């Protein structure tokens, strides 16, 4: 499967380029960067430090998309919306690991999925997506009359959105387990005199610092006991492997908007 990496010069872009080389059935056929990037015109393999691959980095995505089978995208919300539209024009797979998308962004991506096969997830790791299933089951079994749910996440100092896409993914899983809407029952910030905790809400706490790739814990707390479900990312390659797995799974599927739960057969 011929894959294009967008944001090829970034941390995740370089990780994707390296990881593609080790996965059977996947081949790098294009690399995209923004206009004005210092990487334009350079070989994607040389930028990544793995030697010449014969793929030059460009800022003109549509001709590259037209010759590919899929796109791997961990960029920004605005860029991902644009790439979704181009993937729709090219009728190819678009795997989106970008976080921080607004409701309006998601609507535009959903519209593009009429013609592109899009897999979008707040986290591409296989472990996190299994964790989301466990969180949903735990939230359903341990009801709000007894157990409070708090979600704690920590990332490196350079992350620009909060709570993380993974924290929100886990929050949505907990909300499904409780049969409630996360948007109406989440507490994102606590400061000053807040009063007692409101029963049934799902709390979020965000930490930023150092080089932490991603730590997430879902805490279900009752009087006298706590259940903690956690995931710790130790290498960005887990996200790259998951994204490539998603692209290979989506190749040949009909256009639509899918998630990693679909890829893993966990969508019940």
Swiss-Prot record:
Active site: 155 (proton donor/acceptor), 159 (proton donor)
A Pfam family the protein falls into: DapB_N
Reactions the enzyme catalyzes: (S)-2,3,4,5-tetrahydrodipicolinate + NAD(+) + H2O = (2S,4S)-4-hydroxy-2,3,4,5-tetrahydrodipicolinate + NADH + H(+); (S)-2,3,4,5-tetrahydrodipicolinate + NADP(+) + H2O = (2S,4S)-4-hydroxy-2,3,4,5-tetrahydrodipicolinate + NADPH + H(+)
Gene3D superfamilies for this protein: Dihydrodipicolinate Reductase, domain 2, NAD(P)-binding Rossmann-like Domain
Pathway assigned to this chain's UniProt record: Amino-acid biosynthesis; L-lysine biosynthesis via DAP pathway; (S)-tetrahydrodipicolinate from L-aspartate: step 4/4
Keyword Cell cycle among UniProt keywords: no
Protein residues bound to NADP(+): 34
InterPro entries xrefs: DapB_C, DapB_N, DapB_N_CS, DHDPR_bac, NAD(P)-bd_dom_sf
Main location: cytoplasm
Disulfide bridges in this chain: none
GO biological process annotation, one example: diaminopimelate biosynthetic process
CDD domains recorded: DHDPR_N (cd02274)
Catalytic activity, EC: 1.17.1.8
GO terms assigned for molecular function: 4-hydroxy-tetrahydrodipicolinate reductase; NAD binding; NADP binding; oxidoreductase activity, acting on CH or CH2 groups, NAD or NADP as acceptor
Binding locations of (S)-2,3,4,5-tetrahydrodipicolinate: 156, 165-166
Subcellular location: Cytoplasm
Role description: Catalyzes the conversion of 4-hydroxy-tetrahydrodipicolinate (HTPA) to tetrahydrodipicolinate.
Family annotation (HAMAP family): DapB (MF_00102)
Protein name: 4-hydroxy-tetrahydrodipicolinate reductase
Annotated source species: Brucella melitensis biotype 1 (strain ATCC 23456 / CCUG 17765 / NCTC 10094 / 16M)
């Amino acid at each position: 499967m011929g894959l294009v990496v967008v944001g090829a010069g970034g941390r995740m872009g370089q990780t994707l380029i390296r990881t593609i080389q080790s996965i059977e059935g996947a081949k790098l056929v294009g690399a995209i960067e923004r206009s004005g990037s210092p990487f334009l015109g350079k070989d994607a393999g040389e930028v990544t430090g793995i030697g010449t691959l014969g793929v030059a980095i460009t800022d003109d995505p549509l001709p590259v998309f037209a010759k590919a089978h899929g796109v791997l995208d961990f960029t920004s919300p605005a860029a991902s919306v644009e790439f979704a539209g181009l993937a729709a024009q090219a009728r190819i797979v678009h795997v989106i690991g970008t976080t921080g998308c607004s409701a309006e962004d998601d609507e535009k991506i959903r519209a593009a999925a009429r013609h592109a096969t899009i897999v979008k997830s707040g986290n591409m790791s296989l472990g996190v997506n299994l964790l989301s299933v466990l969180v949903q089951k735990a939230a359903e079994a341990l009801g709000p009359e007894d157990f409070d749910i708090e979600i704690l996440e920590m990332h490196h100092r350079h992350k620009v959105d909060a709570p993380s896409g993974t924290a929100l993914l886990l929050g949505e899983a907990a909300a499904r387990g409780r049969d409630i809407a996360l948007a109406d029952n989440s507490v994102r910030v606590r400061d000053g005199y807040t009063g007692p905790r409101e029963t049934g809400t799902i709390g979020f706490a965000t930490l930023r610092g150092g080089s932490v790739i991603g730590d997430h814990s879902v805490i279900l707390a009752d009087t006298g006991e706590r259940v903690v479900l956690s995931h710790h990312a130790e290498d960005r390659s887990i996200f790259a492997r998951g994204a490539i797995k998603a692209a290979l799974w989506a190749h040949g599927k009909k256009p639509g908007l899918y998630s990693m739960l679909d890829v893993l057969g966990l969508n019940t």
